[in-house]
Amino acid sequence: MKFVKYFLILAVCCILLGAGSIYGLYRYIEPQLPDVATLKDVRLQIPMQIYSADGELIAQYGEKRRIPVTLDQIPPEMVKAFIATEDSRFYEHHGVDPVGIFRAASVALFSGHASQGASTITQQLARNFFLSPERTLMRKIKEVFLAIRIEQLLTKEEILELYLNKIYLGYRAYGVGAAAQVYFGKTVDQLTLNEMAVIAGLPKAPSTFNPLYSMDRAVARRNVVLSRMLDEGYITQQQFDQTRTEAINANYHAPEIAFSAPYLSEMVRQEMYNRYGESAYEDGYRIYTTITRKVQQAAQQAVRNNVLDYDMRHGYRGPANVLWKVGESAWDNNKITDTLKALPTYGPLLPAAVTSANPQEATAMLADGSTVALSMEGVRWARPYRSDTQQGPTPRKVTDVLQTGQQIWVRQVGDAWWLAQVPEVNSALVSINPQNGAVMALVGGFDFNQSKFNRATQALRQVGSNIKPFLYTAAMDKGLTLASMLNDVPISRWDAGAGSDWQPKNSPPQYAGLIRLRQGLGQSKNVVMVRAMRAMGVDYAAEYLQRFGFPAQNIVHTESLALGSASFTPMQVARGYAVMANGGFLVDPWFISKIENDQGGVIFEAKPKVACPECDIPVIYGDTQKSNVLENNDVEDVAISREQQNVSVPMPQLEQANQALVAKTGAQEYAPHVINTPLAFLIKSALNTNIFGEPGWQGTGWRAGRDLQRRDIGGKTGTTNSSKDAWFSGYGPGVVTSVWIGFDDHRRNLGHTTASGAIKDQISGYEGGAKSAQPAWDAYMKAVLEGVPEQPLTPPPGIVTVNIDRSTGQLANGGNSREEYFIEGTQPTQQAVHEVGTTIIDNGEAQELF
């Protein structure tokens, strides 16, 4: 009896000592424990998703893929699979399972290793939310106390829902919703018992039990899950027998991107990071952009096709690599495919290896092990590239170009496969809605995988003749008209700084004598632009460009500005052209229309300032002082006259003016009115002539009329010195687009090609705006305007139409006439008299007027 008594006393003492120790340990650790009450309002890390204007997913950013689901959305069989596998006594314990701990300890004692886990689902939840993954005794103790607290705070159902959304299941998938998508491309409610069991088996070792890493291990682990479900009575013997014989059809499924717009998506990502920091990737933001699938894909296709066409006509630079030489032992298929899989794809270009070649055909293997045939049709274009201005002879047989062992690039053209190469030239396209600045499409390069540099917004490139419409607008605001006569003859002037004559030339070097300003712009006459620049003054012209949103620091104050020596981005150029298309308003480009939080609440909605040419909104710069000098035909006085230069209105005054308009007109804010609406119409009309010309001459953009088969468009070519940059920018109903093409390496120019006859409809000759950039503009605008009714140019109030003589710009007095637009009060008043043009004397040298 004494023994029993002592034993009981000892047991009680041990229990009290143990309880006291546990309590003391708890008191010691308690200050270090996080507040589990945060689980009541927990925000799971959800990736940022970017959508098109019509709700299609175009990008997703965030380290963790998670698709939150409620417990009601998860099939009961899946919940039971996790409970059977991870915590069969889940509904019986209070956070910590002594029975489970004893069972795991017993197995470990008798087997010599820990084959069963002792952590309950609640403990795993505590670990996943609050603790590090390190394996230490202190972490385990904290885990136990936290689990008990969690059980006191949350219901079993709340614990399960958090656990099933939080648990890591491999391949960046967090939660069962993401795992169902990653491995099977399904939502959780679409999963079979087989697939549920696979996912339920992942928490123990997601990196090794997943079916993408090891199918054998995945099958074995699935069968363990099924066995435990059978033991717990969650499935029948028949279900067990049938399911364990089923194959696991798993593949990696990326987020369901409807279409890709990588350059614009990256702009959105940067903007979101600037606003919200790292939480942008974790808080489940949904961002809706201004682009749509049809328009964006048309832009990407237009740019890629144009770049590939340019690259093909300049010749083939040879294989990307030689895997084995002719005469050496060929690589086996596995080695070939492993090598090709390590290479990226660029748009439509796929890496391939030539496995056989004869004069008529070559066979190439792709990364997936399939083979394609390259006939002479797909190789004929590949005459040797010698330089940007020289190409070799057209190949006569396939083996002139391809040999076995070469690593090449191929692309599919219709049903055939063609040889290709990764272009060295690059391009950008920006398209905006001129009424409100919404970005309709944006392409920053040939392929985002090739280069993440966004040429649409970051590349400052000389604009060449793309600048002329802005400068002619300045000249007309100063007093010139579309009928003003300017002399198209060569110019030569001593440049003291350079120590040589400055001799701007037309391209091509053809001169027509006295011509109207409309023709000067339509045919892109360089010397005519220089004379107009001299007439209005360089400083006035340079400052006037700021009205179109061009940064002052990028504008040179020299006569070379007339030829486009200023450097702007395609986005800036498109914004400037929008002013001419929308009636004179400077809209701000924007690309995020709405931001929602993870609950669907709208936390941002764009309210762009819009153009309103029909509104009575004054020009914020006031009326430009007209130059009497122009009427007096005295060029030099205009050029040196500083008191007549344009003076910019400070931005605070512009904002005050806009606020006054808002108060007057209501909630809608209007973009700054930077040039008067009649003047904007005149230059818009002149851009139309650049495409359609007049009887007797073509505009430099004539191909757009041929390709689009509509007359409500306008645009302007642009080519810089030595053809280092080529542009085409212009408008159509509801859209303004600018396209640039060139090399990132500023030392290279776009060069010259000769016709080979091997490429259908090949462009040849010197590269420039019309040949190198305009094809992309035409293709894109044709797609965007398909089905859009023509909208003839309609003169706004303040414009009068006068029949003028095309040779003199005066009132018509015969058959050589056309209708011309004038701002009321600037139309000619004298009848045309045909006589020889006047010259004036400048510094002792004969100098033609303007």
Please name every model-derived segment.
Residues 1-51, 89, 108-109:
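N-terminal type II signal-anchor transmembrane helix
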Residues 22, 27, 111-366, 532, ...:
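Non-catalytic, structured segments within soluble enzyme domains
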Residues 67-72, 389-399, 422-427, 450-470, ...:
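Short active-site loop at a secondary-structure junction
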Residues 78, 289, 293-296, 300-302, ...:
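A penicillin-recognizing enzyme superfamily signal
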Residues 82-83, 229, 299, 359, ...:
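Active-site SXXK
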Residues 91-101, 174-177, 236-239, 476-496, ...:
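Short, well-structured active-site flanking segments
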Residues 110-135, 186-189, 256-257, 435, ...:
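Conserved catalytic neighborhood of penicillin-recognizing serine enzymes
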Residues 500-506, 537-575:
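Mid-domain, small-residue-enriched loop/turn segments at the edges of structured enzyme/sensor domains
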